[in-house]
């Protein structure tokens, strides 16, 4: 989520590519696999994010070989002429470039290492890109297993949400072998306007976890500020306008406001349906908590945000967008 948070430009030390700039580095040095431009690409995971991401690859001329644990979501792709595989292993047998977009660490482990996983049929030299948001340690373990099979694994989680996935303006944070970055960039640039090389495998996940922790904190802060203003008699649209002209401005206030009726086209104005689920935010904050524990880093606000989103999940908000924290604050008498 939130490509606007922390990724307005290239950070120091990061390899960076924007859809508005020329790619970094020469494609001439990339292996023949990545230069096979319009050969089929495998895509596994066609949920809220994966579906529009896959469609953007198709728009750029890439034929796809698709798989999802729920066959019904593949129907529209099959009707459009794309291939649908019977398992992740089947995808790996037919494609040497595969992108996965899955909900959790456990899902990624199953898709890669399970009984019918990618590693059962992966070809030497294949490029495997995981855009799921998972524990960095899981990415590192998967990379080791993939390397044993003679293939390449890169983690490339995304930020920007469903809207950016649809428009092809995602931010990708990429971790892996640097000389494979251009090969990954060829595909990721079809789905995102910002593709950043962050370092070794797991670095992309670490960057994404930091971003989502900040996003959760800023969303809670925006919801609290808006709620306070409304209870003080301020018009919510006026308050949002003031915030967005002032130092409190952030992505949660100017692009994804949590108050119903303040903005069109956002989950808060659609009963908090669609978008980025509260369950997923709680999961990502759990990853941040684990990372903080392993690195002995204090995350005081991150820990509180984790507690809030866990409480929301236990009180019926699990399937609503994470901006529903505003509704939660309004309904909780204890706050």
UniProtKB/Swiss-Prot annotation:
The active site is at residue 208. Keywords: Acetylation, Branched-chain amino acid catabolism, Mitochondrion, NAD, Oxidoreductase, Transit peptide. It comes from the Eukaryota. It catalyses: 3-hydroxy-2-methylpropanoate + NAD(+) = 2-methyl-3-oxopropanoate + NADH + H(+). Disulfide bonds: none annotated. GO terms for molecular function: 3-hydroxyisobutyrate dehydrogenase activity; NAD binding; NADP binding. Higher level in kidney, liver, and heart than in muscle. The modification N6-acetyllysine is found at residues 59, 75, 120, 144, 148, 237, 241, 320. Residues 1-35 form a transit peptide. Pathway: Amino-acid degradation; L-valine degradation. Pfam families: NAD_binding_11, NAD_binding_2. Its EC number is 1.1.1.31. One of its GO terms (cellular component) is mitochondrion. Changing residue 212 to Q: Decrease in activity. Its main location: mitochondrion. It is found in: Mitochondrion. The modification N6-succinyllysine is found at residues 59, 75, 94, 140, 148, 237, 241, 296, 320. InterPro entries: 3-OH-isobutyrate_DH-rel_CS (IPR002204), 6-PGluconate_DH-like_C_sf (IPR008927), 6PGD_dom2 (IPR013328), 6PGDH_NADP-bd (IPR006115), HIBADH (IPR011548), HIBADH-like_NADP-bd (IPR029154), HIBADH-related (IPR015815), NAD(P)-bd_dom_sf (IPR036291). NCBIfam families: HIBADH. PANTHER family: 3-HYDROXYISOBUTYRATE DEHYDROGENASE, MITOCHONDRIAL (PTHR22981:SF7), 3-HYDROXYISOBUTYRATE DEHYDROGENASE-RELATED (PTHR22981). Belongs to the HIBADH-related family. 3-hydroxyisobutyrate dehydrogenase subfamily. Homodimer. This is 3-hydroxyisobutyrate dehydrogenase, mitochondrial. It comes from Rattus norvegicus. The lineage of its organism: Eukaryota, Metazoa, Chordata, Craniata, Vertebrata.
């Amino acid at each position: 989520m939130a490509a606007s948070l922390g990724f307005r430009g290239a950070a120091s030390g990061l390899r960076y590519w924007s859809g508005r700039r020329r790619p970094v580095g020469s494609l001439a040095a990339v292996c023949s696999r990545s230069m096979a431009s319009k050969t089929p690409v495998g895509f596994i995971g066609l949920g809220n994010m994966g579906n529009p991401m896959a469609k953007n690859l198709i728009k750029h001329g890439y034929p796809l070989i698709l798989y999802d644990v729920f066959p019904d979501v593949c129907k529209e792709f099959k009707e459009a002429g794309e291939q649908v595989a019977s398992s992740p292993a089947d995808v790996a047998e037919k494609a040497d470039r595969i992108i996965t977009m899955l909900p959790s660490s456990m899902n990624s482990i199953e898709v890669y290492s399970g009984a019918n996983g990618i590693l059962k049929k992966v070809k030497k030299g294949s490029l495997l890109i995981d855009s799921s948001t998972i524990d960095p340690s899981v990415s590192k373990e998967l990379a080791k297993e993939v390397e044993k099979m003679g293939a390449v694994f890169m983690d490339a989680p995304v930020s920007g949400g469903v809207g950016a996935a649809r428009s092809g303006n995602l931010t990708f944070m990429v971790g892996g072998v640097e000389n494979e970055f251009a090969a990954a960039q060829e595909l990721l640039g079809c789905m995102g306007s910002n593709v950043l090389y962050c370092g070794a495998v797991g670095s992309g996940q670490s960057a994404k976890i930091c971003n989502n922790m900040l996003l959760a904190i800023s969303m809670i802060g925006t919801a609290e500020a808006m709620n306070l203003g409304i209870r003080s008699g301020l018009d919510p649209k006026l308050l949002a306008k003031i915030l967005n002209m002032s130092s409190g401005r952030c992505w949660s206030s100017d692009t994804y406001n949590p108050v119903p009726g303040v903005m069109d086209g956002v989950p808060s104005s659609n009963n908090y349906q669609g978008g980025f689920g509260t369950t997923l935010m709680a999961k990502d904050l759990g990853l941040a908590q684990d990372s903080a524990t392993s690195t002995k880093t204090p995350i005081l606000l991150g820990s509180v945000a984790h507690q809030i989103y866990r409480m929301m999940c236990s009180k019926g908000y699990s399937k609503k967008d994470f901006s529903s924290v505003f509704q939660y604050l309004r309904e909780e008498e204890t706050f």
